[in-house]
Amino acid sequence: MEKWHNPSSPKRLRGDTPNSWSELPLDLLTAVFERLSYANFQRAKSVCSSWHSGSRQSVPIQIPWLILFPEYDNNNSCTLFNPEEKGQVYKMKDLGVEFSKSVCTATYGSWLLMRDPLYNLYILNLFTHERVNLPPFESQLGMVKIERTIYDWFHSTLHYNGKEYHKRIRILSTVFWIDEKTKDYVVIWGLGSSCVVYSKKGDKCWNQIPETSNCHHMVYKDHKLYFSTSTYKYEFRIFDFSREIPQQIFQGYVIMQGLTLNRHRGQPGYPFATIDTKLVVTVTGDVLKVDRIVEKETRICRFFYVYKVYSSGSYKKYEKVESLGDEAILLDLGITMLANDTVGLLGNSIYFSGTHTKSKVINDTFIFSLETQKMDPVHKFDCSSAQLSSARWFLPSSHKLD
C-alpha cells in the first residue's frame, strides 16, 4: 500500500509540493480551470508551464466586466471593473493616441469596434492590442451611394426606378463578431433610414442588405442577425449569415420605441416614459424586447418592461416576462447568460449602462432586479458623467491581464 504523506509536513512543503502541483493530470487541471472565473483563470494559468498548457484546453467562466473609456483627447488608457472583485479596478494603458480620440460603438469578447473622428473604422483587442482596419465607409456596393459630409453624418443617394432620392443619414446600431483564432469577422452597421451594410474578412468594401431601411436596433448571435425597424411598419427580421450571402429566414413585427420623453403612457400625467427599446436574444434563441423606462421629470431610469416576441421560429403575441429565471440580460450586448451566483453574476437581472447617445437622459450604470424591481449601483466610480455615459459591459475572452 502506498504510504500516505501529510500535506503539511516540512518535507512535503520543501520538496514535493511544487512537483506535485505541476504534474497534475490534464483532465483534473481542465476540471479545475472550468470552475474558475476570468480573473482567477488568468492567475492560475501563470502558476507554471504545465498549468498554462492546461488552460488552453479550457474556457473560464464568463462574467461581464465594465469598461470606462477616457475622456476625449485626455489619455490613452481605460478602466476595467470586475463585479466579482468588489472595489477592484484595472487600468489598461498604452492603447495609443488614436484610442483616446475614438468612440467604441460595440464589443465582442475582448474586441472593441472603434471609430475615429473622421470615421475611420477598426477593431481593437483590448488586451493584445491587435488591430484590424476596416474598409473606408464610402466604399459601398449596392443601390445606395454614400458620401461623407462631416463627422458622423453622411449623405445617401438612392437610385430607384430611374429616379434619385437624397437623404442625410447618421450611423445608428452597430454589431460585430470575430473569431479569436482565425480572425474571421463580420461587422454590420445600420445607416439610419437608408440601409444596413456589412463587411467580412477579406472584403474591400461594404455590402448592402436590400430592403433594410429605418434600422432601429440589431443583435448578432450564432451567425444570425436580428434586425428591427423604427418606422410605423415596425418590422422584425432574422438573417442567416452562415452563408456567403446573408439570407432572410424570418419576418415579423415588433414595436420599437425610442426618445419618447414627451409621450404619455396611460392616463394623463403619467410620470414615466419609454426612452428606448432593445432586442435581446436568450440562451435558447427566444427574442425579447426590453423597454427602458425613465422618470420624465428627472430623466433617471427607474425600471424595465420585458416581453417575449419570438420563440421557436414563430412570431408571438407579446408575452410579458415577469422573471428571467436563472438568466441575466446583458443589455449592451443584446443577449442573456446563465447566471452563477458563485462568480457574482445575478440571475433574473438586467445589466445596463449609459444610453451611448447625446440625449439629455441621465446615464447610470446599474443592475436592475426583476424580482425586487430595484436598482443596485455597480460601483462608485471616480469619473465624469461623460465617461459613465459611454461605459459598456463586455465579456472578456481568455487573454492575460498584465
Swiss-Prot record:
Xref: InterPro entries: F-box-like_dom_sf, F-box_BR-signaling, F-box_dom, KIB1-4_b-propeller
Transmembrane segments annotated in the record for this chain: none
Cited Pfam families: Beta-prop_KIB1-4, F-box
Matching Gene3D superfamilies: 1.20.1280.50
F-box domain span: 18-64
Disulfide bonds: none
Highest taxon of the lineage: Eukaryota
Name this polypeptide is given: Putative F-box protein At4g22180
